[in-house]
Amino acid sequence: MSRYRGPRLRIIRRLQNLPGLTNKLVESKKNKVSGSDQSIQKKVSQYGIRLEAKQRLRFNYGLTERQLLNYVRIARCAKGSTGQILLQLLEMRLDNILFRLGFVPTIPSARQLINHRHILVNNRIVDVPSFHCKPKDIITIGSPKTYQSILTKRIESFAKDQVPEHLTLSLSEPKKPKGFVNYLINRESIGLKINELLVVEYYSRKA
């Protein structure tokens, strides 16, 4: 299954707000059900609940079905909680790190910057959005022109207290923002509200 490229509002109306996909907030269809319609609503099955959790995770981080399945398989082979390791793997992707640092408003925006070779990790160009960031990595912008045209207003308006504790945003040098990875993210700092166990259960027979 390919990555979704259709209307984003359609997705968040169905799956509720997904900060990585869009910064627009909308009321979900579930909250718009009228009193007369509530009595005829179908009870959601356990499979449906797990499917929705999986879809929320996939669309928030902009993954294909195959990519997410591969991440689940990697998480299953690692020591520790499969669900938490899965979230950690997704959060430490370069495209998500840029988003959490406030360089860009959404993960798709981050992916575009990376694909255009504007992002450096430890002074080396990285053009792979799925690049796994590690502690002590330093993320910078490839050129001042790129920063001025795309990121100036975004960085200046982004409150540093919005950056999670495992990351540090440095604005000490004019027009040269830097992002530092302090350590691997913990569960409390995950940006998406989700029950990751439902996703693990969904893939229990596939991974």
From Swiss-Prot:
UniProt similarity note: Belongs to the universal ribosomal protein uS4 family.
Gene Ontology MF: a single term: structural constituent of ribosome
Predominant location: plastid
Signal peptide: none
UniProt name for this protein: Small ribosomal subunit protein uS4c
General function of this protein: One of the primary rRNA binding proteins, it binds directly to 16S rRNA where it nucleates assembly of the body of the 30S subunit.
Cellular localization per UniProt: Plastid, Chloroplast
Xref: CDD domains: S4
GO cellular component, one term: small ribosomal subunit
GO biological process: ribosomal small subunit biogenesis; translation
HAMAP family from the UniProt entry: Ribosomal_uS4_B
Annotated Pfam families: Ribosomal_S4, S4
Domain named S4 RNA-binding: residues: 92-150
